[in-house]
Amino acid sequence: MAAPAKRARVSGGSPLVAPCPSPRAARAPLPLPAGSSGGEPEGDAVAGFLRWCRRVGLELSPKVTVSRQGTVAGYGMVARESVRAGELLFAVPRSALLSPHTCSISGLLERERGALQSLSGWVPLLLALLHELQAPASPWSPYFALWPELGRLEHPMFWPEEERLRLLKGTGVPEAVEKDLVNIRSEYYSIVLPFMEAHSDLFSPSVRSLELYQQLVALVMAYSFQEPLEEDDDEKEPNSPLMVPAADILNHIANHNANLEYSADYLRMVATQPILEGHEIFNTYGQMANWQLIHMYGFAEPYPNNTDDTADIQMVTVRDAALQGTKDETEKLLVCERWDFLCKQEMVGEEGAFVIGCEEVLTEEELATTLKVLCMPAEEFRDYKERAGWGEEETEDDSLAITDIPKLQESWKRLLRNSVLLTLQTYTTDLKTDQDLLSNKEAYATLSWREQQALQVRYGQKMILHRVLELTN
């Protein structure tokens, strides 16, 4: 799938509107396969899935096996023999993919395509899943047997609100989840439920449930793939998500050793580096911060493993820090005027965030321009505003790498520092509290899964923010 952007510079609306995550996520270790909770034992579920693979032409290399042994979480794929870089691990024929185009109600979904349009773009796939899940003779039943138990998904959207706020306040996750829940409910009652009721012969009462729909949204968010557009198709809408059996079994680490390749007839998983016998095969889904991982997949990478981790400074926080530094009402009005100017230039927004990574500022132009405009002398701002701030001579000065922070003007550094301090106040714990928990193995072991994952998210963000503080001294 196409890798998601690290963060839009001016964000608004639900994360569900964004493209699906790219190649699949690791899941939390708690969920068991759906088949294991009913009648089919776990070993039979794997054997049934492998028989299904042979039947549908899904070619697994004899060098790999599906297993729960030797994996970081749940089911995974392990090398039975050493694998060379470039070797084919498995190939999935397009006929085995589960999508609105391959499901048993594909004709109906195509005819009703206009009525099924939504912000997420996921409704046709979700309806396909709802229909196939209830069908005893669904061609994908052996594939479903390896799914995690839907009632035990660990996404924060399934946490009690109090727990979500207590553990993740300040990280950006609670706000993203609230938008998700609002959009899911709206999508279900305005589009999905009316469609199922209009075709009650195809959707039994057992699947007409907001709870089940929310669980499937989480599963699609974590397990689906999105085929990238061709280079010359950038103007087109993103491709719809689809389910890729076998590919979604792979777990994730940043230093992955496999990659999914798309062709006309097959989707192929290929080793990107040598894999030793007994080692797990990992996919990746792009550069994602820990807050994105826990939001979309229910897990976070332990510090400092996630080299793609980021911390956000809300854009309005920088405005608030600038307002706090004013001495009178006149200065406050000047700050507001400059903020309005930045909004009109689409440099900032009420729901946007400046994104700072481990080694770079990912929104360098936006942050540099904002600091400059909010800190420049009044006369200079008037000239800048008249030129609309976009003179060619300005562009070279608007880059901002982490290593450049100590070289900034003192007024810029002061505003950035105050913005970071305000951001740190939004968390429920301070850095030392989190640090003490992480360094105490016994105390860490007593934490629940959710507490451990939330701690990793908070700590990684705070370490980035504290580094910025040090650089502004």
Curated annotation (Swiss-Prot):
Task: Report the catalytic activity.
Answer: L-lysyl-[protein] + S-adenosyl-L-methionine = N(6)-methyl-L-lysyl-[protein] + S-adenosyl-L-homocysteine + H(+); L-lysyl(8)-[histone H2AZ] + S-adenosyl-L-methionine = N(6)-methyl-L-lysyl(8)-[histone H2AZ] + S-adenosyl-L-homocysteine + H(+)
Give the record's GO CC terms: cytosol; nucleoplasm; nucleus
Please name the SUPFAM superfamilies in this protein's record. RuBisCo LSMT C-terminal, substrate-binding domain, SET domain
Its predominant location is nucleus
Quick one: where's region Disordered?
1-23
- Tell me the subunit arrangement: Monomer, homodimer and homotrimer; these structures are stabilized in the presence of S-adenosyl-L-methionine (SAM).
Instruction: Provide the protein name.
Output: N-lysine methyltransferase SETD6
Q: Which organism is it from?
A: Mus musculus (Mouse)
